[in-house]
Amino acid sequence: MDVNKLLKALDDESNELLLNFTTKKIKEMNLNILKELHLSKKETLELLNKLQEYKYIDEMNELKYGSYIRWIPIEDPNDIQLTKGALFCEMKITDNGVFCICKNYGFPIRHFQISMDKNLIFQKLTEQEMVLLSALDHLSK
């Protein structure tokens, strides 16, 4: 493990929320939320595999600006699919709910919004977060 990367990750205050987790806890949290979709075991495991380096976002303060997110629209229980994702730009709170303003990655700049109430949102873990989780995994043994 690179000690300098670990020290940098520990100094970054935005990683503070991650200190209560391990890789195992994140995987369990992702699995539990996916189980609520009542998909087949195969479909659930496929989604879990695609979300290996992602953390389920339950509250808006957990989202980091500039992070890559993927989501599963849950309005239609017969059409459950994981999106390709986008970059999270900002949070918008309206009378209609809380929305994530996102930007397509690799396309001409196009902003759009997704509702936190109508989607399960997963945020990609950064390299710093992965280093920190690796250390937390080691400490939990």
Regions picked out by a protein language model, each given a short descriptive name:
Residues D76-N96:
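Short beta-strand-centered aromatic/proline hotspots
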Residues C89-I109:
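Basic/aromatic-rich interaction segments and small domains that mediate binding to polyanionic partners
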Residues M1-E16, Y105-K141:
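Intrinsically disordered, low-complexity, charged/polar segments
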Residues Y65-Y68, G85, G97-V98:
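Short, surface-exposed beta-edge/turn micro-motifs
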Residues M1-L37:
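Terminal domain-start segments
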Residues M60-N78:
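Short coil-to-beta transition motif at edge beta-strands of beta-rich domains
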Residues M29-Y65:
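Mixed-charge, Lys/Arg-rich low-complexity intrinsically disordered regions
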